[in-house]
Amino acid sequence: MSEPAVLVDTNVWSTVILPAGKHNQTPELLKWRGLLLGREVVIAAQTEAELLYGAYKASWGATRLLGLRQAIATTPTIPVTADVIEAFARLRTECRFAGHALQAKDHMGDAWIAATGIAHGFPLLTGDSIFGDTPGLTLLEDAS
């Protein structure tokens, strides 16, 4: 049986997938590449939106923006579905009662990413500690 696809967050995708040429071979980058080796990588719709927002906010030119769009096109984007919406609503509620940081409005984007992983059973690879102890979410390192 093949392993499920891995959902990566915006930071991991930007570091591992985006061919920016500025990333050194840091221990974190090498670790992430090792964890993703042989696995299908997917992103949440929220991640695609964050990537494009970052480019627009930084006033990227047409050529650089085209390069980003081409890189995004190499990674399947998981759309927001009824299951993701349900997972998001339940997750935010559980986080509120548990006092988890994903309950906060300023972490709504992270909650959408987590909900995508929960709804589809994808483990999440992230460098962001906010996802630790998220109800119903498996982090890739914990799944190994």
Residue map of PLM features:
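Active-site neighborhoods of divalent-metal-dependent phosphate/nucleic-acid chemistry enzymes
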Residues: 2, 75-123
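Residues that scaffold the ATP/ADP-binding catalytic core of kinase and kinase-like folds
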Residues: 15-17, 54, 88, 134, ...
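General small-molecule cofactor/ligand-binding pocket signal
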Residues: 42, 78, 140
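Histidine- and aromatic-rich ligand-binding microenvironments
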Residues: 8-9, 44, 106-107, 128
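Short, hinge-like loop/turn segments at secondary-structure boundaries
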Residues: 58-62, 95, 141-144
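Short, well-structured N-terminal submotif of metal-dependent ribonuclease cores
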Residues: 1-43, 53-70
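Acidic, PIN/NYN-like endoribonuclease modules and their adjacent C-terminal/linker elements
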Residues: 1-5, 114-144
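A generic structural signal for short hydrophobic patches within well-formed alpha-helices
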Residues: 13, 48-51, 85, 131-132
